[in-house]
UniProtKB/Swiss-Prot annotation:
MVP repeats lie at residues 54-118, 119-170, 171-223, 224-278, 280-328, 329-380, 381-433. GO terms for cellular component: cytoplasm; nucleus; ribonucleoprotein complex. This is Major vault protein. InterPro entries: Band_7/SPFH_dom_sf, MVP, MVP_rep_dom, MVP_rep_sf, MVP_shoulder, Vault_2, Vault_2_sf, Vault_3. It comes from the Eukaryota. Gene3D superfamilies: 2.30.30.560, 2.30.30.570, 2.30.30.620, 6.10.250.720, 6.20.380.10, Band 7 domain, Major Vault Protein repeat. The keyword Transmembrane helix does not apply. It comes from Leishmania major. It holds the Pfam family Vault_4. The keyword Nucleus applies. Disulfide bonds: none annotated.
Length: 833
């Protein structure tokens, strides 16, 4: 400020610098100060620092004051400062800042409000410099809590760490606290650093600086049906005054307290629900707790209702609540003693077994183990089970009567090869090898007796490996396997050409049936042909006493086909192609069946090894194996047919032309004869004319009349003869044309008949193939399956109508209308007027 006269108001001040001594002094108003030449005013008059009530300010580098409160000056006259220190000043008279003093500003404000500590709140403060307070020395680092409600008076030596809210403890809750350092809490209990405890007093709890609040613990409500299972983290004495060891488990029930708050050294294991038993229920408790509170491991305890209880720690109910076993009249229980005890006066040894038969109610005892609940097994006359005696090991089959296993009997499972299991589930006991299911799983109950329906005109061989002898069962029949019997599985050739092991079957069809095979033969002129043969066969078996040799040939189909193929190849090899092509059927039948003593072809081929008889053989097709040869043969056949047809047409045409020429010759001859007769008639006419001229002399009129009459007669006769000649010529021409037409129609009819015969043979072959296909499909599907398919539609319709719940129904169509006029009135019972 450059003015020499400075007017300073009340509660204002300025700093004057003496340029001679370099000392700055403070001048407070109200005053009018005249500045000297060697003085400089550092700033315009500033207001003094005013601290209102409930406020404070912090002055840095405060001046030093004596006991009277006056400012202490240095020898140079400069105000003495406590550099680096600070001073907190509260409400009072406004004061100026001496040179070197600074006002600590926070958020742009030098004067701050005193902090108000509300109720249930405290300030966590820390001493940063030793000081003495009320004859008590407070060391640096000391922390304490200033609890509200009050106004916090700050000190330079103390800093506020944080504001702490009190935690409200409600009923059925507790506050878990942990000690940070060793100290004595408010209740006078010494605490160790890291120790945890619960504060259960209701209301607001303001923690001390030595404590850390871990959280509120909610109490668990207990009832008659709910208990709390706890475990001790360390050894301590619980709230009920009971000493607990580390790892020990116990339960708190409603008898102990309605609400339990888990203590600091308690860990909740689980909520335990009460087990309620009715009069018809019981439980088996494993490892029960005795009167001393210890588990009796390995023991069991049976408890029967009516009762309600809690499972103690260590006790288990593996099987849960069970119903009292009600044993019916047709039921029994298989029991086993696990230790020695007396049962109604009878001594039971460990491991002994017995059966308790109904009707009764049974609850197992601790000394008894229930092995099985057995029931009477109802068996039809065609049903059975396998039973094994566990004492002797004997296995027997029980068939056709209700049966209950005895004490020393068990159901015996008869295991069959997987292939036999799959054949048993197939419709007719046969299956193609290519159609086998690799993932097949049998659903047969192994203890049930094995049954198989032998079809009509079929046979099954069963081998008893204990007696080492087979038996044959002829169908229709039901086979039941004894415990030591097995099926004989047939592995037959199949397909065209025959492939070994293509078909597996449990039953042997006795026939008559047929088989087809394809073989390749070679004639003497090296023509290779593929023949498709079909033959009928059957087994000549005695149905009263069937022979075992029927099953002596495992693959009778393959053996038969090989034999026939060998004979056919040998016979064809001695014939040329043309001869074999013309007489193929006769050559093959003679080769297969052979000839008798008289040279006649036999009627069948018999295999004496298994009584297998082939009765007929048919050549279904014969074609060259070489494609070019086959095409050439077809072309030659077609060419032969065309040549034959054209030759017949030429012969017919030649005959017609010959007949036409003969008719024309006869016609020309007839014309010549007619001309001769005409000339003869003319000659006679001339003679008559001469006579008439002669008569003319006698009388012209008479002669003229007579001449005219004779001329007219002659003319009429000539015309009649000409008409007859024309009619005869027309008849001859018509007959020739008719013969020509008849010959043409005969040739066309013969050609049509040959075409029809070819078409009929093709249709017959197709029909036979289709019939064979249908027959094979029917054989594969089976009669029972076809009957089920035929019945499925009507049965489904009947079930559909039955499910509608109709008492009656009427089915009609538009051609037979039904008059329902007035039906509604009759249904509601109103009489018609």
């Amino acid at each position: 400020m450059s003015d020499s006269v400075i007017r300073i108001k009340r509660y204002h001040y300025i700093h004057i610098l003496d340029n001679n001594t370099n000392v700055t002094r403070t001048i407070s108003g109200p005053v009018v100060y005249t500045r000297k030449e060697h003085e400089t005013c550092l700033f315009d008059p500033c207001p003094c620092v005013s601290v209102p009530p409930r406020h404070y300010c912090v002055v840095k580098n405060p001046c030093v004051r004596d006991e009277a409160g006056e400012v202490v000056l240095e020898s140079s006259g400069q105000v003495k400062l406590r550099l680096g220190d600070a001073e907190i000043r509260f409400e009072g008279e406004p004061f100026p800042l001496y040179p070197g003093e600074e006002l600590d500003c926070r958020d742009g404000k030098g004067v701050q409000k005193l902090q108000l500590i509300p109720p249930n709140t405290g300030l966590h403060v820390r001493c940063v410099r030793d000081f003495k307070d009320a004859d008590r020395l407070v060391g640096a680092g000391t922390e304490w809590m200033v609890a509200g409600p009050q106004t916090y008076i700050p000190r330079v030596e103390v800093v506020v760490v944080e504001e702490v809210k009190a935690t409200v403890i409600y009923p059925n809750t507790a506050l878990m606290v942990q000690a940070n350092v060793n100290f004595t809490d408010r209740g006078g209990v010494p605490r160790v650093a890291g120790e945890k405890w619960l504060v259960r007093a209701l209301g607001a709890y303001l923690q001390s600086v030595e404590e850390t609040v871990l959280g509120l613990i909610q109490g668990t409500m207990l009832s008659d049906l709910k208990a709390l299972r706890l475990s001790a983290v360390r050894s301590f004495t619980d709230v009920y005054g009971k000493g607990r060891r580390a790892g020990e488990q116990w339960q708190v029930t409603l008898k102990d307290a309605p609400v339990h708050i888990i203590d600091a050294y308690e860990m909740k294991v689980a909520d335990v629900a009460a087990v309620s038993l009715s009069a018809k229920e019981y439980v088996i408790i494993h490892h029960p707790v005795d009167d001393t509170g210890h588990n009796r491991f390995g023991e069991t305890l049976v408890r029967r209702g009516e009762c309600t209880f809690f499972l103690q720690p260590g006790e288990t109910m593996p099987r849960g609540v069970e119903q009292v076993l009600v044993v019916g009249k047709e039921e029994a229980l298989l029991l086993e003693a696990v230790c020695e005890y007396r049962d109604r006066g009878e001594k039971r040894q460990p491991g002994s077994r017995w059966m308790v038969r109904g009707p009764l109610e049974y609850i197992p005892a601790n000394e008894v183990k229930l092995l099985e609940h057995r029931r009477m097994m109802a068996l039809d006359k065609n049903e059975g089970i396998y039973v094994m005696n566990t004492t002797t090991g004997e296995v027997r089959a029980v068939i056709g009567k209700p049966y209950m296993l005895d004490v020393n009997e068990v159901l015996w499972e008869k295991h069959l090869p997987l292939a036999v299991e799959e054949l048993l589930e197939s419709p007719n006991g046969s299956i193609q090898t290519s159609e086998r299911n690799p993932g097949f799983v049998s659903h047969r109950e192994k203890y049930r007796i094995v049954r198989f329906n032998v079809q009509h005109n079929a046979a099954v061989q069963i081998y008893d490996y204990r007696k080492k002898q087979p038996r044959i069962v002829l169908g229709p029949n039901l086979v039941m396997l004894a415990p030591h019997e097995e099926f004989t599985v047939l592995s037959l050739s199949g397909g065209t050409p025959k492939v070994p092991n293509s078909l597996q079957s449990l039953q042997l069809f006795l026939g008559p049936r047929f088989s087809s095979d394809t073989i390749v033969v070679e004639t003497s002129d090296h023509a290779r042909l593929r023949l498709r043969l079909s033959y009928n066969w059957y087994f000549d078996i005695d149905r009263v006493n069937p022979s075992q040799r029927t099953f002596s040939v495992p693959d009778f189909i393959g053996d038969c086909c090989k034999t026939i193929a060998s004979r056919v190849r040998g016979a064809v090899a001695s014939e040329d192609f043309d001869s074999f092509h013309r007489n193929s059927a006769k050559i093959i039948r003679t080769a297969v069946f052979g000839v008798d003593e008289t040279g006649e072809t036999k009627k069948n081929l018999r295999f004496t090894a298994n009584d297998f008889v082939v009765t007929n053989i048919d050549v279904q097709s014969s074609e060259p194996t070489d494609e070019k040869t086959r095409d050439s043969l077809q072309k030659s056949v077609q060419l032969a047919i065309e040549i034959t047809t054209k030759s017949q047409e030429a012969a017919a045409r030649h005959g017609n032309e010959l007949k036409d020429q003969e008719a024309k010759g006869q016609l020309e001859r007839q014309k010549l004869l007619d001309k001769i007769e005409v000339e003869n008639a003319r000659t006679k006419w001339l003679e008559l004319q001469a006579k008439s001229e002669a008569v003319q002399a006698s009388g012209q009129s008479v002669a003229e009349a007579k001449a005219r009459a004779e001329a007219l007669l002659i003319e009429v006769r000539s015309e009649m003869q000409q008409a007859e000649m024309r009619a005869r010529a027309y008849r001859i021409s018509a007959e020739a044309e008719l013969q020509k037409l008849q010959q043409r129609q005969a040739l066309e009819l013969e050609y049509t008949q040959r075409q029809n015969e070819i078409d009929v043979s093709k249709a017959r072959a197709a029909a036979e193939a289709e019939a064979e296909k249908v027959k094979r499909m029917v054989d594969c599907i089976g009669r029972d399956t076809l009957v089920a398919i035929a019945r499925a539609g009507p049965e489904t319709q009947v079930k559909l109508l039955s499910s509608l719940g109709l008492k009656g129904y009427l089915i009609t169509d538009g051609n037979s209308p039904v008059n329902l006029f007035g039906t509604a009135q009759g249904m509601i019972g109103e009489p018609k007027k």
